[in-house]
Design a protein with these regions (language model features):
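Short acidic, hydrophobic short linear motifs in intrinsically disordered regions
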Residues: 18-28
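Phospho-regulated, low-complexity intrinsically disordered regions of nuclear gene-regulatory
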Residues: 1-11, 34-48, 52-84
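Short helix-capping/hinge SLiMs at alpha-helix to coil transitions
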Residues: 13-18, 31-32
């Protein structure tokens, strides 16, 4: 796993909340607002992490940067019920 993937996994395991791509980029890179490149790299790493560890990480994704959410599977299930 890469540095960004480890940071995402650490945030999700410790905070246990649902995060968006820009929220993760702010936490990982410590910059506000994050650049498009930072948000894109976090988005790619989050997709890769969700594919590698489906038992620990779940995602909701749609079109665009703002519709991506990642978190623990039980948190995503709660978030999906709340949104839909």
């Amino acid at each position: 796993m890469g540095r960004i993937e480890r940071a995402i996994l650490n945030l999700i395991e410790n905070e246990g909340d649902v995060h968006g791509a820009e929220d993760l980029a702010i936490e990982i890179y410590n910059s506000f607002p994050p650049t498009r490149a930072q948000t894109g790299s976090v988005l790619r790493a989050a997709h890769a992490l969700a594919r590698k560890q489906p038992d620990k990480i779940a995602e909701i994704s749609g079109k665009g940067r703002d519709s991506f959410w990642i978190g623990a599977p039980h948190e995503i299930a709660l978030y999906r019920r709340w949104v839909c």
